[in-house]
């Protein structure tokens, strides 16, 4: 079944320091697996636009955060509002390159035991895709679609958070 995932995203313009992953148990220390991230990639990160500035997140059961998040619909181009100093690179429309974060909260109901993937039509430029704090994919070009398998990490019937960190620090054509 296909779902439209364009609505209901949260966006933060700028990079956010990601905390190191929680420590793995001694049995798994030698494995090459990722462990759950903290910070904006995690399931329990406080990104609600209405909760901006909340200093006591115990009632929210979420990590404390001071970043402002806004609601957006995809496709979304955060560089269109970027700072445009005349000393910038004209190939980028003079925009200053920087990273940003997108997050999507969703509760799947019909995925139990099924292969589940999310298809991205394109993300400019480098990106990392997380589900519930687990790094699932990296993609390094703006002009190609890619898919991410969510099957092993998705939680049917529970809230899930898909987080995407986008970084356009490397040169990439920006033509408006």
PLM feature segments, named:
Residues 3, 12-16, 34, 77, ...:
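Accessory beta-strand-rich segments of carbohydrate-active enzymes
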Residues 83-91:
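N-terminal glycine-rich cofactor-binding segment
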Residues 1-84, 163-174:
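Accessory carbohydrate-binding/adhesion or oligomerization-edge regions at the termini
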């Amino acid at each position: 079944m296909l779902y439209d995932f364009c609505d209901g995203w949260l966006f933060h313009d700028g990079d956010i320091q990601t905390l190191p992953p929680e420590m793995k148990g001694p049995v798994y220390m030698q494995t090459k697996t990722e462990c759950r991230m903290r910070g904006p990639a995690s399931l329990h990160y406080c990104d609600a636009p209405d909760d901006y500035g909340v200093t006591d997140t115990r009632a929210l059961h979420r990590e404390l955060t001071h970043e402002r998040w806004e609601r957006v619909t995809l496709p979304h181009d955060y560089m269109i509002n970027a700072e445009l100093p005349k000393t910038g690179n004209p190939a980028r429309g003079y925009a200053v390159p920087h990273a940003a974060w997108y997050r999507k909260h969703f509760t799947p109901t019909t995925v139990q035991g099924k292969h589940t993937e999310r298809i991205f039509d394109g993300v400019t430029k480098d990106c990392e895709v997380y589900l519930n704090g687990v790094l699932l994919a990296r993609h390094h070009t703006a002009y190609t679609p890619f898919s991410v398998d969510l099957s092993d990490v998705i939680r049917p019937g529970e809230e899930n958070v898909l987080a995407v960190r986008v970084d356009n620090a490397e040169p990439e054509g920006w033509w408006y």
